[in-house]
Amino acid sequence: AKRMSIMGICNKLAWPVAPLFFALVVADQTNVQTSDLYLPFYIIIGVFLLLGIISLMAPLPEVKAAGEDESDTANCPYAANKTSIWQFPHLVLGALTLFIYVGVETLSLSTAVDYAKALNLENPDLYAWIPSIGMVIGYICGIILIPQYLTQDMAMRICACIGVAGSLAIVLLPAEISIWAIFLMALGCSLMWPALWPLAMADLGKFTKSGSALLTMAIAGGAVIPTVFGFLQEGLGAQGAYWLALPCFLFILYYGVAGYKIRTK
């Protein structure tokens, strides 16, 4: 959880930095042409290629979880008689929870600027920092508190409750004030990944790699949930569309309370 929190800080700081990078590369933002997008994307492609080469050449060790070896059943007896990852209900529910979480996290990180524009607030681009600051503060708390003071499931429950409170605040407070509640919504998302991943991956044994692949595919929620949000905006408006976040956080809370404990014989 600590390592994931540290990497999360690096990841979330990039959200507000990216628009600033684009502003530096594109001189005239009032008249942006398609050709102006080539240079920043060439730079991004170059950075990714460089990182890929470095990762390929780095002597990274093969890491195995307890019981991951096919012949090793002593360390993970629960997985010994299983034949498929679909026989792990806590993993399947965890993948669904991760799908929902990534979607609602993407909402908190990517909609602040558009919401500020819809409210006709000055300098809407500056509001991109609100969710990022919330996420980073949450990650710092995770580094300090997990596992010495908070268990992973407890951290998940606390964050889900914060997310529920933030979602309600966004839709119920006056619009000009509600945009600041996106901070709470983002704070509620902060420790989800470091808390959810270990809970969903527990007791998988020889299915650890397959379970990890299933959870990774659940990241697609970051594309699906915002799309649903966009459709809701057309009918409910910029503020009302945030009702979508409430059932998402409630399901996450369910998983943190009971879902991760479910096991089959």
What are the residue ranges of the model-derived segments?
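Intracellular juxtamembrane helix-capping segments at the cytosolic ends
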Residues: 1, 190-205
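Helix-loop-helix hairpin linking two adjacent transmembrane segments in secondary transporters
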Residues: 2-60
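A membrane-interface helix-boundary motif in multi-pass transporters
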Residues: 24-45, 154, 228-249
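Helix-to-loop junctions at the C-terminal end of transmembrane segments
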Residues: 26, 138-152, 233
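Multi-pass alpha-helical transporter architecture, strongest
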Residues: 50-59, 246-265
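Juxtamembrane intracellular "pre-TM" segments in multi-pass secondary transporters
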Residues: 65-94
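Extracytoplasmic gate region of multi-pass secondary transporters
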Residues: 83-129, 135
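C-terminal transmembrane helical hairpin of 12-TM major facilitator-type secondary transporters
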Residues: 151-196
